Regions:
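Structural signature of eukaryotic scaffold interfaces centered on beta-propeller domains
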Residues: 27-41, 152-167
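Small/polar beta-strand repeat architecture
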Residues: 61-166, 175-179, 198-200
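N-terminal beta-propeller domains
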Residues: 1-66, 178-201
Length: 201
């Protein structure tokens, strides 16, 4: 019995390639389905289907929305981020980078809570407040990026009954309990899921 090895047709075997941790899925407590989306050899994505949503991956990373400038982070429990007109909603997942001073938050993912127009609190994936009282004081700079996702009609229980077919930038998705859906990519962070309107003829 061989484990973590690749057997070649001519008889030899070699150690299998390694894997890379890219990101935690949206909901680690429930099943998630990964479906490939390949437009060309240079434009390939991985689609993460979870309960009522899809997230997107490319080039070993999550697809993120545009930069939101951070102008302050409190040393408090919970940590409160100031970012003018950020546009986030409670429960959004964001990645923070490029902060000077409070570097403990850099490169990490947080859930957004306690949203106001210009501020939001940081919690971890379990919804526990991020206590930044022991962090280095915020100095300057920093950006946040929301993890890009779209909503779907597919529940966790339905994910593995999905059938799909792709043509160029369009994927057709079927499930016995739902209308046929068309997933379209028009830009890196512009994906839409719409009902297919069949015409008699």
């Amino acid at each position: 019995t061989l484990e973590n090895l690749v057997v070649y047709p001519h008889g030899a075997a070699a150690r299998r390639p390694g894997s890379t941790f890219v990101a935690e899925v949206a909901d680690s407590d429930n099943k998630t389905r990964l479906i490939p989306f390949e437009f060309s050899t240079t434009q390939t994505y991985m689609l993460e289907f979870s309960n009522l949503k899809i997230r997107f991956y490319k080039d070993n990373g999550s697809i993120l929305e545009g930069d939101k400038t951070i102008t302050g982070i409190t040393q408090a429990n919970p940590a409160v981020v100031t970012s003018t007109s950020h546009g986030y909603s409670n429960g959004d997942e964001v990645v923070i980078t490029a902060v000077v001073g409070m570097t403990q938050v850099n490169g990490k993912r947080f859930l957004v809570a306690g949203v106001t127009t210009n501020t939001f609190q940081l919690t971890d994936k379990d919804g526990t407040n991020v206590n930044s009282t022991g962090y280095t004081a915020y100095g300057s700079a920093g950006i946040s990026n929301k993890v890009y996702e779209i909503t779907t009609p597919y529940t966790t229980a339905q994910l593995f009954d999905i059938k799909f077919a792709q043509s160029a930038d369009v994927m057709y998705i079927t499930h016995p309990s739902h209308e046929v859906e068309k997933l379209s990519r028009t830009a890196h962070t512009t994906w839409t899921l719409t009902d297919v309107d069949f015409t008699n003829g």
